[in-house]
Swiss-Prot record:
Alphabetical keyword list: Cytoplasm, Elongation factor, Protein biosynthesis
Predominant location category: cytoplasm
Cellular component terms per the entry's GO annotation: cytoplasm
GO terms classed as biological process: peptide biosynthetic process
Pfam families: EFP, EFP_N, Elong-fact-P_C
Known role: Involved in peptide bond synthesis. Stimulates efficient translation and peptide-bond synthesis on native or reconstituted 70S ribosomes in vitro. Probably functions indirectly by altering the affinity of the ribosome for aminoacyl-tRNA, thus increasing their reactivity as acceptors for peptidyl transferase.
Species name: Nitratidesulfovibrio vulgaris (strain ATCC 29579 / DSM 644 / CCUG 34227 / NCIMB 8303 / VKM B-1760 / Hildenborough)
GO molecular function: translation elongation factor activity
Name the record gives this protein: Elongation factor P
Keyword Protein biosynthesis annotated: yes
Length: 185
């Protein structure tokens, strides 16, 4: 159990049997009565953000969340097939649960998977990945007046905007949160 004094951004709590993540919180004391804590909570299951107010010292539950190291094996229809690195059990995770992160996965890649009551909820990828450009248009000479970009298809199939000097076969660093080009490797 957590007390409201334990609240901080990113803390995961359970309320009415549903796991939430604290997005924002603020302690306040009204003119009359005890102190209160206003929170913005993100429902981990569906992503909705709700406001909730707690009395100071109120207790809330800890969700049954677990983070495990797994290896991405392959796609099967709309599912990702992952293997637990400790038990070697295979786990199926629907692609919609990944918020588009599945586009960064290569066969054999190691990822962290967030589980709630044994069911997969989310993938945790590194902040940046190095991927190879498999398809892009050649840059035009002299077209460097401003910050010009062009689309480039990467080895995992996702398309990102890259500067014109990036060519097919180059290995580039990509931010997995914003899908932005970070530099060449």
């Amino acid at each position: 159990m957590y007390s409201t004094t334990d609240f901080r951004k990113g803390l995961k709590i359970e309320l009415d049997g549903t796991p939430f993540e604290i997005v924002d919180f603020q302690h306040f004391k009204p003119g009359k009565g005890g102190a209160m804590v206003r929170t913005k909570l993100r429902n981990i299951l569906n992503g909705r953000v709700v406001d909730n107010t707690f009395r100071s010292g109120e207790k809330v539950g800890r969700p049954d969340l677990e983070s495990r190291d797994m290896q991405y094996l392959y796609h099967e229809g709309d599912d990702l097939v992952l293997m637990d690195l400790t038990t070697y059990e295979q786990l199926y995770m629907h692609e919609d649960l990944t918020d588009g992160k599945a586009g960064f996965l290569k066969d054999g890649q190691q990822v962290r998977v967030l589980l709630y009551n044994g069911k997969p909820l989310d993938l945790e990828l590194p902040v940046s990945l190095v991927l190879e450009v498999v398809e892009t248009e050649p840059g035009a000479k002299g077209d460097t007046v401003s910050n010009v970009t062009k689309p480039a298809k990467l080895e995992t199939g996702i398309v990102v905007q890259v500067p014109i000097f990036v060519n097919q076969g180059d290995r580039i660093k990509v931010d997995t949160r914003s899908r932005e080009y970070l530099g060449r490797e």
